[in-house]
């Protein structure tokens, strides 16, 4: 399931990110690509060792851990520290699948990539082309969101960033190991969580059905989660 998570960063944070990123030193994006995907990757990234990467990454991590919609959709267990990229004119990243296992930067710890995330840092009208195209069982989905918004989708999906024809596309990208690895189970839990939240709004926390459904939700988490 593809999720749109709005306003992960506010406009002031985005403006500060952009100021710092536009003055930064960029390296070729192939450094974080697998052998196969490197052949179709043409973009630029902030170095993983750059202090700016660490600074911006910490802000993104704090924002997503505090975002209730992200928590409900991803059920995150571990998060790869975010990286940052830019696509200038004629740059793109052809169809590829993300590596199934990745190292957490600066450690020997590995995580399973269940969910891929893109945090948009350019407004849609600042560049042409550059859509994130995600392929799933229902076809192709073209994604271009406002700056500060996140798209969250299963890492099993083939996806690409189409060629930039004008302007520059700035973004952050990262991966999540979920408490629940199966996408269909996460979808079910998210739908159940949505129903509980709507019932709480309309009937209050003391409504008996809220308590019953909350009990079911947490028992399913116990049944399906991996720690």
From Swiss-Prot:
Cofactor binding notes: Binds 1 Fe(2+) ion per subunit.
Which segments of the protein form a coiled coil according to its record?
none
Looking up NCBIfam families in the UniProt record yields: PRK05467.1-3, PRK05467.1-4
Write the protein's name: PKHD-type hydroxylase A1S_0473
The answer to whether keyword Iron applies is: yes
Positions that bind 2-oxoglutarate: 169
Question: Has UniProt tagged this entry with the keyword Zinc?
Answer: no
Task: Give the binding site residues for Fe cation.
Answer: 96, 98, 159
